[in-house]
């Protein structure tokens, strides 16, 4: 694995290998809290968009592996403001670091970065396109909290048009047998046709606008992303259209996930229910990103 740009670039066996390595990393965290697999190595985090969990979990993961972190979160303090191209930025920074994690508002920016980098590049989110490390931690959460990925029944609710986490996860789930997916969204935020076409025939799909979470293993809530709307009035038409409450969940045997941040799509009263796993899901980002960093670096020096 040279880079991690899209879930389309890796297969089922590579996914399972990353999940197995993530278990080993979680065990190390629980036993010692750190290791020295990447001692003396440097991760560059290039965040052209705001981030809390992804950026901090990458930094935590690298430091837990014994490495160091450089990077930026405010492009106003970089040569981007002088007109430097992304390709040139990557060529320079790949000379300073052993690994790069990049978040960028433009679809395709991560792939362009990989094409211009001397070191492994990890896509930490490119526009509404892909977010593969979130997908891998989602799969790890499902494996740990549900117990299986094959024959999974999952409902995605909310912004399925701009939600890159949903696009990536659906593509990954299509590699596993017996998966059934419910796509629940307003008409304005339906899953892009190209994603549907990519997974159709590989898994059982159903699309609807009303919340229906009977007979599912996982409910995956998503935020309506105001920052993706060109017309803010269109955002306010769908804001708050879905809100998961204690009444929806009851005593259902279901795992509730959310990539976070949330706004108002999950009532805060749900947080204390045993079915709520979204904060644990966020924690899993550290061992999973530790595994990704370790495996990518090892492959780069073979």
UniProtKB/Swiss-Prot annotation:
Swiss-Prot/TrEMBL catalytic activity: carbamoyl phosphate + L-aspartate = N-carbamoyl-L-aspartate + phosphate + H(+)
Keywords: Pyrimidine biosynthesis, Transferase
Coiled-coil residues: none
Pfam families per record: OTCace, OTCace_N
SUPFAM superfamilies linked to this entry: Aspartate/ornithine carbamoyltransferase
Gene3D superfamilies from the UniProt entry: Aspartate/ornithine carbamoyltransferase
Residue sites binding carbamoyl phosphate per the record: 53-54, 103, 131, 134, 260-261
EC number: 2.1.3.2
GO term, biological process aspect, one: 'de novo' UMP biosynthetic process
Gene Ontology MF terms: amino acid binding; aspartate carbamoyltransferase activity
Residues the entry annotates as binding L-aspartate: 82, 164, 223
Pathway(s) of this molecule: Pyrimidine metabolism; UMP biosynthesis via de novo pathway; (S)-dihydroorotate from bicarbonate: step 2/3
Alphabetical list of NCBIfam families matching this protein: asp_carb_tr, PRK00856.1
Subunit structure, as described in the record: Heterooligomer of catalytic and regulatory chains.
Function statement: Catalyzes the condensation of carbamoyl phosphate and aspartate to form carbamoyl aspartate and inorganic phosphate, the committed step in the de novo pyrimidine nucleotide biosynthesis pathway.
Stored PANTHER family: ASPARTATE CARBAMOYLTRANSFERASE, ORNITHINE CARBAMOYLTRANSFERASE, MITOCHONDRIAL
Family that this chain belongs to: Belongs to the aspartate/ornithine carbamoyltransferase superfamily. ATCase family.
Name used for this protein in its record: Aspartate carbamoyltransferase catalytic subunit
Source species: Methanococcus maripaludis (strain C5 / ATCC BAA-1333)
